[in-house]
Curated annotation (Swiss-Prot):
InterPro entries: GCS_T, GCS_T_bac, GCST_C, GCV_T_N, GcvT/YgfZ/DmdA, GcvT/YgfZ_C, TrmE/GcvT_dom1. Its EC number is 2.1.2.10. Gene3D superfamilies: Probable tRNA modification gtpase trme, domain 1. Belongs to the GcvT family. GO terms for cellular component: glycine cleavage complex. It comes from Natronomonas pharaonis (strain ATCC 35678 / DSM 2160 / CIP 103997 / JCM 8858 / NBRC 14720 / NCIMB 2260 / Gabara) (Halobacterium pharaonis). The glycine cleavage system catalyzes the degradation of glycine. Keywords: Aminotransferase, Transferase. Pfam families: GCV_T, GCV_T_C. The keyword Transferase applies. The gene is gcvT. GO terms for molecular function: aminomethyltransferase activity; transaminase activity. GO terms for biological process: glycine decarboxylation via glycine cleavage system. This is Probable aminomethyltransferase.
Length: 358
């Protein structure tokens, strides 16, 4: 099966980007170096092609009701131009995906952004439940119709201002229609880096126009991963996977994205888990010894395996090896001393409150 390519693929290859497969897409992993790109976002601004993320539009009289019953947060309460972070769970409360849901400025359409490679799966899920519940909603997988670019960093909003695009009035998780380099865009004050910034959604044909107008460091998936890990953000396929690592929002530390005042697929199971408390939870780990924890490495306490690393890296900002992983709740208190097995050797590690960087 051939890989999907983003609208900016030619621009990336012309720039000499190193490419990698991710979620069925061929995407840039780095342009210059992960460290250069990471530091640009922490210190000034960087731009990311995130067109591999899905865009699913839901419209019709029951669009809000359908989306509210399939996501863990209170989507029905969104005002036009507002967005929220939510999980998508099965009957057991297990995360199938995490997403940002927008109520578009027109007030009539909802847009949600599933992770790379999940767009058609999630579109079909919405259609199936609309039929099952006899809800009047139209579900359109618009992933191939749009390009999506993230502009992140402390100077991101000033950079847009230099293009006569003012978004300082937008609060976090607010979106508005703006014109960038002559292109109509949906601009939201959201991101996946732990920095301020925006994400821009616009028609595919205008991708190179918008990309070239944003005069800052291009960044690939490598820096996107180190940045999100420092911020303690989840990565689907690592921190949760319904097949290989089934986790609930409470286990994955995104209970803030669950509103049990709404009724959704999995809400009964999650209400029960919140009452009882999860047996395991995601924690941050900072290694004390030389070595880098990686996905799949064992976490040990007093020589016994108690958990597994889901993501790990050498943090460019902190100058330390950091990781995320699941352990029983008795080991989740910050300051708890554990170890990670790296190449057969136990490396001392300490549980650290998330995020690592804020």
């Amino acid at each position: 099966m051939s890989l999907r390519t983003p609208p900016l693929f030619d621009a990336h290859t012309d720039a000499g980007a190193k490419l990698t497969e991710f979620g069925g897409w061929e995407m840039p992993v780095e342009f210059d170096s992960i460290r250069t790109e990471h530091d640009a976002v922490r210190e000034s601004a960087g731009k990311f092609d995130i067109s591999h993320m899905g865009e699913i539009e839901v419209s019709g009289p029951d669009a809000a009701a359908l989306t509210n019953r399939l996501t863990t947060n209170d989507v029905a309460s969104l005002a036009p131009g507002e967005a929220t972070y939510a999980g998508i769970t099965d009957d057991d409360g297990v995360l199938l995906d995490d997403t940002v849901v927008y109520r578009l400025p027109d007030g009539a359409t909802y847009l949600f952004v599933p992770n790379a490679g999940n767009d058609e799966l999630m579109a079909e899920r919405w259609r199936s439940f609309a039929d099952r519940w006899d809800l009047a909603a139209t579900v359109d997988n618009a992933t191939d119709d749009y390009a999506m670019v993230a502009l992140q960093g402390p100077d991101a909003l000033e950079l847009l201002s230099s293009l006569d695009v003012d978004v300082f009035d937008l609060s976090r998780f607010e979106a508005a229609e703006r014109t960038v380099a002559g292109v109509d865009c949906l601009v939201s004050r959201t991101g996946y880096t732990g920095e301020d910034g925006v994400e821009l959604l616009f028609e595919t044909a205008a991708a190179e126009t918008v990309w070239s107008a944003l005069d800052c460091q291009p960044c690939g998936l490598g820096a996107r991963d180190t940045l999100r890990l420092e911020a303690g953000f989840l990565l689907g396929g690592n921190e949760f996977d319904p097949e290989t690592n089934p986790r609930t929002p409470y286990e994955a530390n995104i209970g803030f994205a669950v509103d049990l005042g709404t009724e959704f697929v999995g809400s009964d199971a999650l209400a029960a888990q919140r009452e009882a408390g999860p047996d395991e939870r995601l924690v941050g780990l900072r290694l004390q010894d030389r070595g880098i924890a990686r996905h799949g490495h064992d976490i040990v306490a007093a020589g016994d395996v108690v958990g597994e690393v889901t993501s790990g890296t050498m943090s460019p900002t902190l100058g330390a090896a950091i990781a995320l992983g699941y352990v029983p709740v008795e080991y989740t208190e910050p300051g708890t001393e554990l170890a990670v097995v790296v190449r057969g050797d136990e490396k001392d590690a300490v549980v650290e409150a998330l995020p690592f960087y804020e």
